[in-house]
């Protein structure tokens, strides 16, 4: 069995209770790794969103991520030019000033026309798109309209990808134990066979306003990151598929891909580490999550 780095001690969430650990979990922070953050359902413009943004900026002091993936509902309510300022630019001002790039996907509350044309979302007018960083390729999808053209595109894009890591993200979760929405089964029927066929490693979604990590399904680890602004406290309904969850406070995630390992942490608005682990990409693109 692959040995964990001795400097890493993880915290895990069981029944929404934060379990104590001896030390604070750390990331390897290797110079040649891909480092990014994950946020979703954040664009409220309310104090909790600003506090999450502050925690992200603080985390970056020791974990210098250069990109943030956004899993939708990037802005709620009106989405005028001034709303992009109060619900995006101001909450993440230190990150934007440091040159951190944000890559958005569309949620059901997003104004697609406004989002697609907003330069700091880096969508370049495309509802779905992909981009690469070192050995990782990211695929952003529009789960609001999973039409045949988009399905054909993701099938082809995944088939043609030779990258070691394939990470997909979009708004509606294929798996979720959130009480408000739960899994998007019709979307899962369409996308999961494609993901399995072409070796997708990890999928990030939102929509349910909780943090959740699902036990690997057909070799894929699914995360719900829907509480970076909005929150439905106590909304998780744990099942046999639940690996970890946190629904007592807003949260965001930090991820580092280093070779065949993907280290991840979920952090709360208060700065607590509420989940963490390592996903190891093994032979034949099979993965193993520790723990």
Predicted regions: what is each one?
Residues 1-4:
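Positively charged n-region of N-terminal signal peptides that target proteins for export
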Residues 43, 141-144, 224, 265-272, ...:
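Secondary-structure transition/turn motif
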Residues 28-30, 35, 57, 76-166, ...:
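Extended active-site neighborhood of metal-dependent phosphoesterases/phosphodiesterases
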Residues 41, 72-73, 107-108, 171, ...:
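Active-site glycine-centered loops adjacent to acidic/histidine catalytic or metal-binding residues
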Residues 66-68, 164-170:
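Generic beta-sheet signal
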Residues 6-17:
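Bacterial N-terminal signal peptides
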């Amino acid at each position: 069995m692959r040995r964990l780095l001795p400097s890493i001690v993880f915290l895990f969430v069981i029944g929404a209770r934060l379990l104590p650990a001896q030390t604070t979990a750390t990331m390897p922070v290797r110079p040649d790794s891909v480092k990014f953050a994950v946020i979703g359902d954040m664009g409220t413009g309310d104090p909790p969103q600003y506090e999450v943004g502050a925690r992200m900026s603080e985390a970056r002091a020791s974990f210098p991520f250069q990109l943030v993936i956004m899993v939708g509902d990037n802005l709620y309510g009106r989405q005028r030019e001034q709303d992009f300022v109060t619900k995006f630019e101001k909450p993440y001002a230190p990150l934007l000033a440091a040159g951190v790039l944000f890559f958005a996907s569309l949620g059901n509350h997003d104004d697609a026309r406004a989002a697609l044309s907003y330069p700091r979302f880096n969508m370049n007018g495309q509802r779905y798109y992909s981009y690469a960083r070192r050995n990782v390729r990211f695929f952003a999808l529009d789960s609001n309209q999973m039409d045949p053209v988009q399905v054909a595109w993701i099938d082809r894009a995944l088939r043609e990808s030779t990258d070691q890591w394939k990470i997909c993200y979009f708004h509606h979760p294929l798996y979720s134990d959130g009480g408000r929405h739960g899994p998007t089964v019709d979307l899962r029927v369409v996308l999961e066979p494609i993901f399995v066929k072409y070796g997708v490693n990890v999928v990030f979604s939102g929509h349910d306003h909780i943090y959740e990590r699902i036990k690997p399904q057909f070799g894929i680890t699914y995360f719900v990151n829907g509480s970076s602004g909005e929150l439905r406290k106590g909304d998780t309904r744990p099942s046999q598929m639940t690996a970890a969850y946190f629904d007592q406070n807003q949260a965001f995630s930090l991820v580092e891909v280093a070779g065949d390992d993907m280290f991840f942490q979920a952090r709360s608005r208060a700065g607590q580490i509420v989940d963490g682990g390592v996903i190891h990409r093994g032979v034949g693109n099979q993965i193993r999550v520790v723990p």
